[in-house]
């Protein structure tokens, strides 16, 4: 509803011994003057495969805030697509990931700035250790200074991505 605030928790966990495949999809719409805080925790065993897609559309002066923690899965992938569809829409995307042991974690963010005065902030941090692998990519489309970022973390590398701000010219 217009001007409302909501908090949603997406918790994906399980024991280390169980073998599983998860394919999760979430489609959220943030209305005018509303704020949505989405908390996502991925903490599954080394024998799990977790593929997740989140689609978010943000209305006028609305804000979508993602707090993402990827702490475990044999293979984990997040595809996040955010559409800043109206003037002064905003997104704040923060997260951390730990790819240790033989885990492989992929994070792909795509932010479309489709209206004037939109704003997005991305702040992701990660660690890869052992034989663990982590992939992070960011595309901020339609922004006045759109940039593409791509980082690959290899064993024994600590990955600390600088935060980035993209704004659509008014």
Annotate each predicted stretch with a short phrase.
Residues 1-170:
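Conserved beta-strand/loop scaffold segments within soluble protein domains that form the structured core
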